[in-house]
């Protein structure tokens, strides 16, 4: 396991994280600002905050000094885990809006009497919610019920106006 004691290596790791994640989800930007901070703030500060959030054992000996760079690399690993969460959120929204939503529209067009009921948990809740945003305009929604369990998104996703920026709305406003 390579953990160089070099701030430039931490910065490079943060850059690579950004390349893995691609661009943040502009549509869902109102939900959290954490993804941008994770990729744009000072890497030592970001990774330090993540390291502080995870308990460590057996560090520092009698002086309690510990391994500063080891701690920051532990934080970097936690930051990468968080980034994978953001990436999965983005993916679920894209699949819902660009995949499931249009598919439900085609099913409805083929059989307008069919009643569709959707259920989703965690990222699945996000997927089925964004499917509503991906339904074709016009013919009315074929979805008769939507049940969300512990959805992987903020309730602000449905807001007409975001509390932190009243000029913006949630990505699922009006759903």
Residue ranges and their predicted role:
Residues 1, 55-175:
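Serine-dependent carboxylesterase/thioesterase catalytic core
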